[in-house]
């Protein structure tokens, strides 16, 4: 262990205290815009993650519908269309679910935790509909179900609420908690657009963009869930 000059935050590195850095394997479920971004970010931040945690994070497998499709910046050998291949791999300790929707995401998350794997999800719909039973499964299997990326545009708010402010009594939470809400309020405040007129404009905008009804409903209800569910704010 080496202590460097005063003021250097990385002078003493956890990895050095723990000995040789261990490798942690993860699997990504989904390789769309979010999934590809997670993979690339994990690579860019590899050294920082190692310095701060003493562990090397490696994406071992990526679950997709079409493994033969070329995706820029991601090695082809990582892709698989077999969930069982990921589930039954003892080296994979973390499953990162970024595929969206309810099914098969719900089944995969449940099975991963029952197999003892830790889960990270950015799936608002899934948590809004099945948050309680999923957290029960996580508790029963002594697994983590991390969901910060699914709340308020990934603003780091859940961990401070559950840990840093665990001894404080929360009486109120105020804020603009998603991009859709922020966009609507900006139209109303800066352009003076009334809500009725705005609603008609939004409806036409959705039709022009051919946004699926399911996605539009999720965008509109995003501000109501899952941040506001009481069980998600109880200190650990």
What are these regions, as identified by a protein language model?
Residues 167-236:
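Active-site-lining helix/loop region of Rossmann-like oxidoreductase modules
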Residues 5, 15-114:
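N-terminal glycine-/serine-/threonine-rich beta1-alpha1-beta2 phosphate-ribose binding loop
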């Amino acid at each position: 262990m080496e202590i460097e000059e005063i003021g250097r935050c990385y002078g003493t590195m956890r990895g050095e205290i723990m000995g040789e850095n261990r490798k942690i394997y993860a699997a990504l479920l989904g390789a769309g815009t979010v999934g590809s971004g997670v993979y690339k970010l994990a690579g860019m931040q590899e050294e920082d993650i190692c310095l701060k945690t003493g562990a090397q994070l490696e994406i071992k497998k990526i679950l997709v519908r079409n493994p033969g499709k070329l995706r820029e910046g991601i090695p082809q050998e990582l892709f698989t269309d077999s969930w069982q291949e990921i589930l039954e791999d003892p080296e994979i300790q973390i499953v990162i679910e970024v595929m969206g929707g309810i099914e098969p995401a719900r089944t995969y998350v449940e099975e991963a935790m029952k197999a003892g794997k830790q889960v990270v999800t950015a799936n608002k719909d899934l948590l809004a509909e099945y948050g309680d039973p999923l957290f029960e499964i996580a508790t029963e299997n002594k697994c983590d179900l991390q969901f910060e990326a699914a709340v308020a545009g990934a603003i780091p708010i859940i961990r401070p609420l559950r840990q840093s402010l665990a001894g404080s009594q929360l009486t109120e939470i105020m804020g603009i908690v998603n991009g859709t809400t922020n966009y609507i309020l900006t139209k109303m405040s800066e352009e003076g657009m009334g809500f009725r007129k705005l609603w008609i404009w939004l409806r036409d905008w959705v039709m022009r963009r051919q946004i699926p009804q399911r996605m539009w409903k999720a965008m509109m209800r995003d501000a109501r869930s899952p941040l506001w569910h009481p069980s998600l704010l109880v200190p650990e």
